[in-house]
């Protein structure tokens, strides 16, 4: 058992509810008891309403205006799986509404989040509106720069708010205190889905929403957010769609990795988290995350097969890097030699580390020692370092770094 494991005492079991659910859903008592003790729900209906998130009304009004006037919309995303699925979801949904839309995902070397060079590039391409997904909540300078260019910005993000809210046209984040919606742990793709939900509700297209939930499920599982409340509902409903997914690229990928039963097997969060998501993640780590987005949005089956071959090749390269695991081995050796496990925070830095896998290594170090962990790639020529951080329950590493 892992040291410092957090024990959670069971709730006082509501046996009246258990008997009711057993009658209605024919559940085993043990399963129902586990569901009750974990505060889970069997309900798969979402808990949100149209404008439960602050600025949702402003965002949808501006998007409808852009669609009506055929204005150029760019979706700006992150290069991890949450960002990839967020971009794909919003691109597909806006395209269906008739929007003039494209997407931009920075290369990993550009760094996480918004950057001024990219914003200038989008402005030069006569972009009228940028919608960020899975990034932007702390990009105050970048949004100020966009305002100077008269470039409208809608931020959709789920990360911690570390200071003032950027002065974008609209800022949608489940962690905003002004929200009516009380659940604060949406993934980026869940936040993007809330925007799509609001748009489609106003267009009387709610029946067209369900088909997107497999994309939402992949991003939600990959981002390791708590699978409770609406996150659990996204995943539960989305996993059931994978057998009959309407997205040609996803269908081709599932056929490739589950050749015997892709269309009949029952999919679990494990399949997404450990088999499907790493294939998309490898694109952002080693190549260009736009490859992964193209698999979601491409309608030509032959092109999809070519994209899949490249993604699988990237994933093999990623696995080989991890198997060699020089970074993990070097990190563990340094931790043990210097007894860093006795400190409140573990920090390991080296110029030979590869930025594409330091996040994976940080997660493995966290699992091994259960201490907040920072793994850094030192870029000697630039005089900076790139880091990935992982933390334990009860320690907000963002607040620690800002203090």
Where are these regions (language model features)?
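Short alpha-helices
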Residues: 89, 164-205, 209-221
